[in-house]
Amino acid sequence: MEQREIKYLLTMEGNTESFEVPVFARSLEEATLQAEQYEDAGFVVTRIRPEVKA
């Protein structure tokens, strides 16, 4: 059985503001690995959470 991808939101912070970037992953662990790529590029990731649909 294939596991579908979930939309996660990464919260990143800069010097004066924070913003959210969507990533698609099969698990929180996979989303964390994607967040590490942003950190390697110089961004500060402060939160990873699944998208909550209203």
Curated annotation (Swiss-Prot):
Cysteines joined through disulfide linkages: none
Presence of the UniProt keyword Zinc-finger in the record: no
BP GO annotations: symbiont-mediated suppression of host gene expression
InterPro entries in the record: RNA_pol_inhibitor, RNA_pol_inhibitor_sf
Organism domain of life: Viruses
Alphabetical list of Pfam families matching this protein: RNA_pol_inhib (PF16857)
Keywords assigned by UniProt, alphabetized: Bacterial host gene expression shutoff by virus, Bacterial host transcription shutoff by virus, Host gene expression shutoff by virus, Host-virus interaction
Function text: Acts as an inhibitor of bacterial RNA polymerase.
Name the record gives this protein: Bacterial RNA polymerase inhibitor
